[in-house]
């Protein structure tokens, strides 16, 4: 993906979480990042009125769509499809260590 292509907009949940994360940290001191995210998910599911965040997300998506159209109109060629990566050149396998000469002699004698 080109570095100039506009970044995708955040979801309503992510907008809310970014603004609420510090308060969750204060309410749950010493929590791991995963615990904070889990608690954020619980709070989001319990949130009654999400319209503020959904409206912000809609506005950001509209701005994103406009920016993408401008990008593509100005010669942006990224279609959004991931490009196939070339496989790295195969590295030769490591050679097995040769047995020491004394071990080889012992094997020869035992036969």
Curated annotation (Swiss-Prot):
Keywords: Chromosome, DNA-binding, Nucleus, Phosphoprotein. One of its GO terms (biological process) is regulation of transcription by RNA polymerase II. Residues 102-111 have a biased composition (Acidic residues). The keyword Nucleus applies. InterPro entries: HMG_box_dom, HMG_box_dom_sf, HMGB. Gene3D superfamilies: High mobility group box domain. Residues 82-98 have a biased composition (Basic residues). The modification Phosphoserine is found at residue 11. The keyword DNA-binding applies. Residues 72-111 are annotated as: Disordered. It is found in: Nucleus; Chromosome. GO terms for cellular component: chromosome; nucleus. Residues 6-72 bind DNA. SUPFAM superfamilies: HMG-box (SSF47095). Pfam families: HMG_box (PF00505). Its main location: nucleus. GO terms for molecular function: DNA binding, bending. Belongs to the HMGB family. This is High mobility group protein Z. It comes from Drosophila melanogaster (Fruit fly). The lineage of its organism: Eukaryota, Metazoa, Ecdysozoa, Arthropoda, Hexapoda. The gene is HmgZ.
